[in-house]
Amino acid sequence: MKTKVGVLYGGKSPEHQVSLSTAMAVMNAIDPHKFDVIPIYITPEGQWIKGEQLTGPIEEIKQLQFTSAATALIPVSLNQVPAADSAAGGNEETIDVIFPLLHGPNGEDGTVQGLLEILNIPYVGNGVLASAVGMDKVMMKNLFAQAGLRQAKYIAVTKYDWQKRGETVYDRIERELGYPCFVKPANAGSSVGISKCKQRGDLKAAFIEAFQYDRKIIIEEAIVGREIEIGVIGNDEPICSVVGEIVPKKEFYDYEAKYEDGQTELIIPADVTKEQYETIKQMAITAFQVLDLSGLARVDFFLAEDGAVYINEVNTMPGFTPYSMFPLLWQHSGVPYPELIERLIALALERHQEKQTITYTFKKEKR
């Protein structure tokens, strides 16, 4: 009997289009002999819409952008996702596992993971806490610091602080970080809202841009060096892929460079020494464990000119587009695309089974 996989994609997020690209690639790569695939689309407005079970490859992204004429999934019944005729009183179709291919806020940040936990539905990837911390760059870096992982210096600023004490904030940046520096939304991915600042005059526009996507931003010192990434999969015993290097043709690896073909070069495996690889690997495993990650993650690093390794961030749901680093890293590590997806689904079911052994009630014995 095939495993029924509900692929969840889209979302009320700045990274909606990225999610569509990822979903198309993953659904076309899932082994149809082992899995039945049911697409579940979250519109930009937040409506959940279920499509029909796939019977063949998806040719265009627009095929995944369902309208309300398809099966709306709200309201949802606990412990299962309704099939098309459930609202009319027909048979209900239980989905075995959800594969959430959501990027950014309202999807990769623990919100959807929390819903799936309440519904007691197995799902691929990281749990509620890990997803939330993995999305919030400030909290993530605070935990990195506590774990002793080398990273760039950083400052966190809220929109309220900036509006009240803007010049003081700029003074602190110049005093503690200097130029160049990067300004980023604390809760966003895919390089959305990121700016590189070379002087004080660049900061205001960068802050305005970043605050479009979050009420909290992070400013980081620029590390001169190479951008290195590594893939991690697993639960309690995570394993690492080979490392890859990003060589952007633009000044830095922004949204367009990530998702428009030809804007960047990926070198896999990256040219690093054995010692550098071991350092990157161990730092990635430490980050995976410190953030209590499970399933998968891509961990990003800087390799400075002096050979020092700096951890940058983790991505709890890395992209699976044709140009994405994560699946390419595993292909070069001997794990083909369909097998990678199969492993992630198996890890999700394994973690869910473990959770079923936990007792959630407590009765005090009478004396």
UniProtKB/Swiss-Prot annotation:
Cofactor(s) the protein requires to work: Mg(2+); Mn(2+)
GO MF annotation terms: ATP binding; D-alanine-D-alanine ligase activity; metal ion binding
Residues bound to ATP: 174-229
Domain of life, per lineage: Bacteria
Coiled-coil residue windows: none
Localization: Cytoplasm
Keyword Cytoplasm tagged: yes
Pathway entry: Cell wall biogenesis; peptidoglycan biosynthesis
Membrane-crossing residue ranges in chain numbering: none
Keyword set, alphabetical order: ATP-binding, Cell shape, Cell wall biogenesis/degradation, Cytoplasm, Ligase, Magnesium, Manganese, Metal-binding, Nucleotide-binding, Peptidoglycan synthesis
EC number(s) given by UniProt: 6.3.2.4
Residues involved in Mg(2+) 2 binding: 313, 315
Annotated signal peptide: none
InterPro entries hit by this protein: ATP-grasp, ATP_grasp_subdomain_1, D-Ala_lig_Van_CS, D_ala_D_ala, Dala_Dala_lig_C, Dala_Dala_lig_N, PreATP-grasp_dom_sf
Pfam family membership, one: Dala_Dala_lig_C
Residues that, per the record, bind Mg(2+) 1: 300, 313
SUPFAM superfamilies assigned: Glutathione synthetase ATP-binding domain-like, PreATP-grasp domain
Catalytic activity: 2 D-alanine + ATP = D-alanyl-D-alanine + ADP + phosphate + H(+)
Entry GO terms, CC: cytosol
BP terms from Gene Ontology: cell wall organization; peptidoglycan biosynthetic process; regulation of cell shape
Co-factor note (free text): Binds 2 magnesium or manganese ions per subunit.
Keyword Manganese: yes
Function: Cell wall formation.
PANTHER family: D-ALANINE--D-ALANINE LIGASE, D-ALANINE--D-ALANINE LIGASE A
Similarity remark: Belongs to the D-alanine--D-alanine ligase family.
Protein name, UniProt field: D-alanine--D-alanine ligase
Organism: Geobacillus kaustophilus (strain HTA426)
Gene transcribed to yield this protein: ddl
